[in-house]
Amino acid sequence: MLGIDTNVLVRYLIRDDQPQYERARRLVTRQSAKGEPILISLLVLLETEWVLRSRYNLAKADICSALSALLDTSDLAFEDEATIEVALYNWKDSAADFADCLIEARNRRLGCHGTATLDGKALKLPGFVSI
């Protein structure tokens, strides 16, 4: 398995630099032909959401759709797909940041009964507790 960095994933999704997109696409195709999916870590996914939102000004709904589509791609593997699915589900209808949704979902998968926070938006999500 081969992991990728955020810039490769962003090029794969956005296609704003055709030569770099082609390099990313060929990498995914080559790995798939070898039966080795590309790994997307939680950190890469989190940074990708940030780049799509802050650099490309994509709407939350568009980012949710793009990240959800990645989950359906058999050529890609994810560090913790179940956590990502829960985080995306919670994020789509909340005012909280994707990072908060990912933190809470990951903590719950690791056995935490809650996640303490001072973030008012995060407190509106199930699983966060105020301190």
Predicted region positions:
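Conserved glycosyltransferase catalytic-site signature
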Residues: T6, L42, E81, D100-C101
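Acidic catalytic patch
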Residues: L42-V44, S65-D93
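Alpha-helix capping/helix-boundary segments
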Residues: V44, T83, L102-I103, K121-A122
